[in-house]
């Protein structure tokens, strides 16, 4: 289990929720 991997995934999720237009 790598905490750094969780932080990276959390950052990606935050980016996706902050900029949902990029996914459309």
Swiss-Prot record:
GO molecular function, one term: retinal binding
Secreted found in the keyword field: yes
Domain of life the protein comes from: Eukaryota
Keywords in alphabetical order: Extracellular matrix, Secreted, Transport, Vitamin A
Compartment(s): Secreted, Extracellular space, Extracellular matrix, Interphotoreceptor matrix
GO cellular component terms, semicolon-separated: extracellular region; interphotoreceptor matrix
Primary localization class, coarse: secreted
Function: IRBP shuttles 11-cis and all trans retinoids between the retinol isomerase in the pigment epithelium and the visual pigments in the photoreceptor cells of the retina.
Name the UniProt record assigns to this protein: Retinol-binding protein 3
Record organism: Ovis aries (Sheep)
Lineage per the UniProt record: Eukaryota, Metazoa, Chordata, Craniata, Vertebrata
